Every structure is written in structure tokens, then in C-alpha cells.
Amino acid sequence: DRDSCVDKSKCGKYGYYQECQDCCKNAGHNGGTCVYYKCKCNP
């Protein structure tokens, strides 16, 4: 599911989203970005 990483990945205030990226990649997505402190996976 596209937002499966939202609760599992930290999104810091200053663009720290490696954890989000890794989670999304592991879930089979093309990375991810942080939007309002929440991790959103790319399609």
C-alpha cells in the first residue's frame, strides 16, 4: 500500500528523509518524500 511507510518512517524538520526513502524502496516504490512530517511514497 502506497502509504505503508507513513507511520514507520521519521520525517525530520529539515529534510531528513533517508528513513522514508529506504522504507519506500524496500516496499517496492520509487523512493519517497516527506510532506508535512509524513512519509509519502512515490508511485
UniProtKB/Swiss-Prot annotation:
InterPro entries xref list: Ergtoxin, Scorpion_toxin-like_sf
Coiled-coil intervals: none
Tissue: Expressed by the venom gland.
Subcellular location: Secreted
Record bears the keyword Cell membrane: no
The keyword Disulfide bond is assigned to this record: yes
Annotated S-S bridges: C5-C23, C11-C34, C20-C39, C24-C41
Listed GO CC annotations: extracellular region
Recorded GO MF terms: potassium channel inhibitor activity; toxin activity
Keyword terms of this UniProt record: Disulfide bond, Ion channel impairing toxin, Knottin, Neurotoxin, Potassium channel impairing toxin, Secreted, Toxin, Voltage-gated potassium channel impairing toxin
PROSITE patterns on file: ERGTX
UniProt cross-references to Gene3D superfamilies, sorted A to Z: Knottin, scorpion toxin-like
SUPFAM superfamilies: Scorpion toxin-like (SSF57095)
Physiological role: Reversibly blocks Kv11/ERG potassium channels.
Domain notes: The presence of a 'disulfide through disulfide knot' structurally defines this protein as a knottin. Has the CSalpha/beta fold, which comprises one or two short alpha helices connected to anti-parallel beta-sheets stabilized by three or four disulfide bonds.
Record family assignment: Belongs to the ergtoxin family. Gamma-KTx 4 subfamily.
Protein name listed in UniProt: Potassium channel toxin gamma-KTx 4.2
Species in which this protein is naturally found: Centruroides noxius
